[in-house]
């Protein structure tokens, strides 16, 4: 074989190889988006910027998805649904020579019922659901073959590549198609989404938005309720929360450019979490409760149970000190020399602050004004409440045989009780007389030193019963007498020091012992007589 023949065969093979390596252009709406090899290339058809793609999946009861696809030779090619992709990848050789094909839009949306448990908990607690990856995969598999709506005027095509041109000639045609492209259009459409506060949405309604196409066709977009995230700020503190909102469409044209605005307006019937809030708290003490208002701040806590995240918002009072009033009507105990009763009085506040181990405590004390409700009465400031009964201590000094005793009698404060005639009175319990308990030592004789320190406690209670001169006091209406039963015990005794002998007198109670012994002998003597009776 001649050398020339070998070179001729090699040249023919090289020419054939060069002919097979052909570049093609990928067109979207007759606009070139990529140049790839016909045999090995994949056309990345990019969806126009005016078309949105999104993927939001919370559960099978709440999702909002929009994606695109095309069909070439009975094979379906989708965008990346999970990542809200906007590129349809199609092998160039599959579409080459098939002409322009349309692509389709799929929009799937489902919202929670406004009165459902999940919707209410989300609004009140700001709950953020956690979705498992398997649930998302199963959901995508169930919707990836959903039939969509063809977008009018939007096509995908693979044609021969013409260097230096943004649009290429269709396959099998030598004539340029630039005159058919939309690059010479004088108008463009820009879509944007804006989330605003509810104050600018008062005039927006739930009507549908209508857009008119170039061919006179109209597209009606239904306005649905969606969940949006808004940010609220107060006192230099901001926080985000989710609320339902409705969409409102607005259109403006500037220098031939048409802009379509989509504004989501939060529904005003849902309350948002405030950085500070005035709340009402109830304070209780001694079986009495009262309400007061204090400023509180929100505290957020998050718990996770079985993969479900729950967020709680608790308002905590800024300070535990109640709102101090300049004057306040309080319940007090008024006493004279013989009786005590409950009444009301106007009091003024006194604030006291103490610090113990770094903890600051604020106290508010209300002190009654004036000397008493009637002449001769004073307010008791050391009343004691026990088992629902109020007692007021009263100290009395008693001097016997040169010794002075201080007795503390607890007077029972009784409330008004009805009489037989239907009238009411407030009996007061007298200060019981200080008497020595049986077996108690007598006070020391003259000249004794001060010795023991005990207290005398008198418990007295006014009760209806038989009246005797020894146990009655004046206190009823029209001079009526009130029966009083008293119980006295000695708990404190102060013996005054007198001049004379420095020795303390000791009482042996011999008389009491002798009387007790005599009674015992008489009882023993009567025992034998019982056998003869």
UniProtKB/Swiss-Prot annotation:
Protein name, UniProt field: Yeast-form wall Protein 1
Residue span of region Disordered: 161-219, 418-451
Protein's cellular compartments: Secreted; Secreted, Cell wall; Membrane
Chief location category: secreted
Family: Belongs to the flocculin family.
GO CC, alphabetical: cell surface; extracellular region; extracellular vesicle; fungal-type cell wall; hyphal cell wall; side of membrane; yeast-form cell wall
Protein topology in the membrane: Lipid-anchor; GPI-anchor
Source species, domain of life: Eukaryota
The species this protein was found in: Candida albicans (strain SC5314 / ATCC MYA-2876)
Low complexity bias (residue ranges): 163-214, 427-451
Keywords of the record: Cell adhesion, Cell wall, Glycoprotein, GPI-anchor, Lipoprotein, Membrane, Secreted, Signal
Free-text disruption phenotype from the record: Leads to increased adhesion and biofilm formation.
Positions of GPI-anchor amidated glycine lipidation: 511
Induction: Expression is greatest during yeast exponential-phase growth, but down-regulated in stationary phase and upon filamentation. Expression is also increased during growth in hypoxic conditions. Expression decreases in biofilm cultures and becomes undetectable through late stage biofilm formation. Up-regulated when the extracellular phosphate concentration is low or in presence of Cis-2-dodecenoic acid (BDSF). Repressed during cell wall regeneration. Expression is positively regulated by EFG1 and EFH1, and negatively regulated by SSN6 and SSK1.
Name of the encoding gene: YWP1
